[in-house]
């Protein structure tokens, strides 16, 4: 079993739904966790599919909540966006971009293949300093509230199993295979170095 707690990052596109739901569940189970997005802007559903609400990553969850409350309280209550932002603002002040974080993690879990590719590209573009390995694992999660919750519990279970391995480097492939068989999902996995 690792002596230190796993340092975990969960990454989706806008650091709103999937990564924040996993952040919430992992932090309640005492994991050392942070969450991020990889997009250039934060996008939330708007009044129509072609009219999203777009924010800068510097915008706080509180500011987004207030803005949407003013725009259309009924719509954003009904579609769950205000509830999601309320949860988010209780976890941390604002969304964060993975590309702007220079902290080291043992495990980076992404929520879709495009985000996985962006994280791997970012990590591989950095100059190696410590040669410390970081495992990047993709768990495909549809971007809706129900799937975010189911995906967060799967991510939590995966992190708990990895935390309890004797030798993460040698056991992770077998562990991921077991999770694939059990969940019916395919996980992408690679190792990058800091």
UniProtKB/Swiss-Prot annotation:
Q: Which Pfam family, any one of them, does this sequence belong to? A: Ssu72
- Please list the GO biological process terms of this entry: mRNA processing; termination of RNA polymerase II transcription
Indicate where this protein is primarily found.
nucleus
Reaction(s) catalysed (UniProt annotation): O-phospho-L-seryl-[protein] + H2O = L-seryl-[protein] + phosphate; O-phospho-L-threonyl-[protein] + H2O = L-threonyl-[protein] + phosphate
Coiled coil region boundaries: 160-186
Q: Name the Enzyme Commission number(s) assigned to this protein.
A: 3.1.3.16
Q: Which GO molecular function annotations are given, in alphabetical order?
A: RNA polymerase II CTD heptapeptide repeat phosphatase activity
Q: Name one GO cellular component term.
A: cytoplasm
The record's keywords, sorted A to Z, are: Coiled coil, Cytoplasm, Hydrolase, mRNA processing, Nucleus, Protein phosphatase
Where does it localize? Nucleus; Cytoplasm
Functional note: May be involved in the C-terminal domain of RNA polymerase II dephosphorylation, RNA processing and termination.
Write out the similarity annotation: Belongs to the SSU72 phosphatase family.
- Name of the protein this chain belongs to: RNA polymerase II subunit A C-terminal domain phosphatase SSU72
The source organism is Xenopus laevis
The gene designation is ssu72
